[in-house]
From Swiss-Prot:
Oligomeric form and interacting partners: Part of the 30S ribosomal subunit. Forms a loose heterodimer with protein S19. Forms two bridges to the 50S subunit in the 70S ribosome.
One GO cellular component term: cytosol
NCBIfam families reported for this sequence: uS13_bact
GO terms of biological process kind: translation
Keywords in alphabetical order: Ribonucleoprotein, Ribosomal protein, RNA-binding, rRNA-binding, tRNA-binding
Presence of the UniProt keyword Transcription in the record: no
Entry's family note: Belongs to the universal ribosomal protein uS13 family.
Stretches for region Disordered: 93-118
Entry protein name: Small ribosomal subunit protein uS13
Its biological purpose: Located at the top of the head of the 30S subunit, it contacts several helices of the 16S rRNA. In the 70S ribosome it contacts the 23S rRNA (bridge B1a) and protein L5 of the 50S subunit (bridge B1b), connecting the 2 subunits; these bridges are implicated in subunit movement. Contacts the tRNAs in the A and P-sites.
Pfam families: Ribosomal_S13
InterPro entries referenced in this protein's UniProt entry, alphabetically: Rbsml_uS13_C (IPR027437), Ribosomal_uS13 (IPR001892), Ribosomal_uS13-like_H2TH (IPR010979), Ribosomal_uS13_bac-type (IPR019980), Ribosomal_uS13_CS (IPR018269)
Length: 118
C-alpha cells in the first residue's frame, strides 16, 4: 500500500478512486490531480513508479487535507461559537445550523429523546 498525506492508499484500485481515501480530496480534486501529474484516471496505483507517486504527493501537498483540514473546520466552528452569532449558538446547542425544522425532526443532531422529569 502506498502512503499519501499519511493515509494508506489501496494499490488495487484506480488512481482517482484511491486518492479519494484522503480526507479533503473528492472525485473532482482527484481528477484534477491526475490531470496535473499526467496520470491516466484508470491507472492502478500499483502500476505507478516512484517518480509518479512523488509527483502525486507533491500535488496533494498543495491542497489542505487530513489533519490541517479537520483543524481548520473545527477552528471555523469555534470562531462562530465565540462570536455568538446565530450559527454559533446553534452549534453550541447541538441543533441544526442551516435552517431545518427542529420541532419534530432533527433527531440525529439532537440525540436520543430525554424524558421529562416530574
Amino acid at each position: 500500500m502506498a502512503r499519501i498525506a499519511g493515509v494508506n492508499i489501496p494499490d488495487h484500485k484506480h488512481a482517482v478512486i484511491s486518492l479519494t481515501y484522503v480526507f479533503g480530496i473528492g472525485k473532482t480534486t482527484a481528477k484534477q490531480i491526475c490531470a496535473a501529474t499526467g496520470v491516466a484516471e484508470s491507472t492502478k496505483i500499483s502500476a505507478l513508479d516512484d517518480a509518479k507517486m512523488d509527483e502525486i504527493r507533491a500535488e496533494v501537498a498543495k491542497h489542505t487535507v487530513e489533519g490541517d483540514l479537520r483543524r481548520e473546520i473545527s477552528m471555523n466552528i469555534k470562531r462562530l461559537m465565540d462570536l455568538g452569532c446565530y450559527r454559533g449558538l446553534r452549534h453550541r446547542r447541538s441543533l441544526p445550523v442551516r435552517g431545518q425544522r427542529s420541532k419534530t425532526n432533527a433527531r440525529t443532531r439532537k440525540g436520543p429523546r430525554k424524558p421529562i422529569k416530574k
